[in-house]
Design a protein with these regions (language model features):
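Acidic, glycine-rich active-site loops and adjacent beta-strand->loop/helix elements
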Residues: 28-34, 198-199, 228, 304
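A generic structural motif
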Residues: 30-32, 188, 195, 311
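N-terminal Rossmann-like or analogous alpha/beta NTP/dinucleotide-binding catalytic cores
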Residues: 1-107, 203-216, 256
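Active-site cores that bind ATP or allylic diphosphates and position pyrophosphate for catalysis
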Residues: 91-223, 228-235, 243, 401
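Alpha-helix N-cap/helix-initiation motif
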Residues: 2-6, 33, 196-199, 246, ...
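Basic, alpha-helical terminal appendages of large translation-related enzymes
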Residues: 23-27, 38, 54-60, 67-68, ...
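Residue-level signal for inorganic ion chemistry
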Residues: 13, 44, 84, 88, ...
């Protein structure tokens, strides 16, 4: 699955590339074999394609600096790790470490390791390597002084070198660690902007020292603060927070999700400061990394629902029907009901597609309901006047020749005038009688037009019977 935070990182990277007329490169980082998840690469391709985040170079489209799968670049990483040993920025380590000791530190974790191999003369170390002795290659971090790095969001950050650990760059199986592979590949692939989560801030000083040891130009770092479930907790699939796939499955529109995710921790400036709705193309024109916030962003599902509802309203009737039809087909099985008419009715009030079955469940079958629904303070209806209204409505609708929303409304407004009551005293009881619900996707006459004359009259008679008990 694609975590919302990962989608945001991909989106920001794509926007930076498009804004500056650069190249967006898709690289598969699979050097930490223990963390590989089957099918994860397919999810990346599928999600990026769905979201319109097209890449200029990558494993599937090729490019001038491939291969774009890191595990296929093993020899290249070995070459640069050994080159770094020659330059004094790294050393061979022959300590008998367990796999756990050699494993990569989690983002933000410092794994202290003081190694005697650091002082081995290079020629002696090379002889031991040639003799077949197992080894890893570690970064040689200075014991004294400080390292300062610049981040586009967080500014300059200075770290004491004594707090940094001589991290493993090349593991005993010949594969690089994540940190080393990314520095080498970012340089070789000409990466100018590195966008990642703020949990990698603690690794940035070590990256800087690697760039300096090689004599390479340091790219622009853009560290994004985490996406939070609330003020205290990060979003986590383990705790039931939705992934991109979950949101789409629930019936959110990709365009709405992207729009919302873009604004999770980034704010437009100037004339767009108050604006909330953007297409991907519009974002690409105005996206500026100076708008990325240092503060964590809270994922507000209610705000996303609201935004999605606005996107639903903007869809053409045809486009909405295309999205809603699979859901409506399973929710409304009566062949006499026009699904396009149902879609037209629900579209203005639809927040997410997965809400639709509950919104239209009364169409196939009138649910059992309490007569208390007829009592409505605002509509000024009681059990008594609701019964009177339905009894007056029945003969009027029985005699109606043309069964359309307009004709129904006209006839019922005329009835209310004749009875000398507010329109709502007639319309609210009718709405309850034909739907059995307090909340419906349309008004009373719209529901009657949808259900047809025979079904509507049968439900009105049921309402009269219930209120007469």
């Amino acid at each position: 699955y694609m975590h919302v935070g990962n989608l945001r990182t991909a989106l920001y990277t794509w926007l930076i590339a498009r804004r500056h007329h650069g190249k967006f490169i898709l690289r598969i980082e699979d050097t930490d074999q223990g963390r590989l998840v089957e099918g994860a690469v397919d999810v990346i391709y599928k999600t990026m394609a769905e979201c319109g985040l097209d890449h200029d170079e990558g494993p599937d489209v090729g490019g001038p600096v491939g291969p774009y799968i890191q595990s296929e670049r093993r020899e290249l990483f070995g070459k640069y790790a050994k080159l770094l040993c020659e330059k004094g920025g790294a050393y061979y380590c022959f300590c008998q470490k367990s796999d756990e000791d050699e494993s990569e530190a989690a983002p933000g974790e410092i794994k202290k390791h003081v190694c005697a191999c650091r002082d081995l003369p290079l020629e002696e170390a090379k002889k031991r390597v040639e003799a077949g002795e197992p080894f890893v290659i570690r970064q040689r971090i200075p014991h004294e002084g400080t390292t300062t790095f610049h981040d586009a969001s967080f500014g300059d950050i200075t770290v004491e070198n004594k707090e940094l650990e001589d991290q493993v760059l090349l593991k005993s199986d010949g594969l690089p660690t994540y940190n080393f592979a990314n520095v080498v590949d970012d340089h070789l692939m000409g990466i100018t902007h590195v966008v990642r989560g703020s949990e990698y801030l603690s690794s940035a000083p070590k990256y800087n020292l690697l760039y300096e040891a090689f004599g390479w130009e340091i790219p622009t770092y853009v560290h994004c603060s985490p996406v939070m479930r609330d003020a205290q907790h990060k979003m986590s699939k383990r705790h039931g927070d939705p992934s991109y796939e979950d949101l789409i499955r629930e019936g959110y529109l990709t365009e709405a999700v992207l729009n919302y995710v873009a604004l999770l921790g980034w704010s437009p400036k100037g004339e767009n400061a108050e604006r909330e709705f953007y297409t991907l193309a519009e974002l690409a024109e105005i996206f500026d990394i100076s708008g990325i916030s240092k503060s964590p962003a809270v994922f507000d599902i209610n705000k996303l629902r609201w935004m999605n509802a606005e996107y639903m309203k903007k869809l053409s009737p045809e486009a909405f029907f295309a999205k809603a039809e699979p859901v409506l087909k399973t929710a409304v099985t009566n062949p006499a009901v026009d699904l396009r008419a149902v879609a037209a009715l629900v579209q203005p009030r639809c927040e997410i597609l997965s809400d639709l079955p509950e919104r239209v469940d009364f169409i196939d079958k009138l649910p059992e309901y309490s007569t208390e629904l007829y009592v409505h303070k605002k509509s000024k209806t009681t059990l008594e006047n609701s019964l009177s209204s339905l009894q007056a409505i029945l003969p009027v609708l029985e005699g109606l020749q043309t069964w359309t929303n307009e004709n129904l409304y006209e006839a019922l407004v005329a009835l209310a005038a004749k009875l000398e009551v507010k329109n709502s005293v007639v319309l609210w009881p009718l709405r309850v009688a034909v739907s059995g619900k307090a909340s419906t996707p349309g008004g009373a006459t719209e529901l009657c037009a949808l259900l047809g004359k025979e079904e509507s009259l049968a439900r009105i008679r049921t309402g009269i019977e219930l209120l007469s008990r």
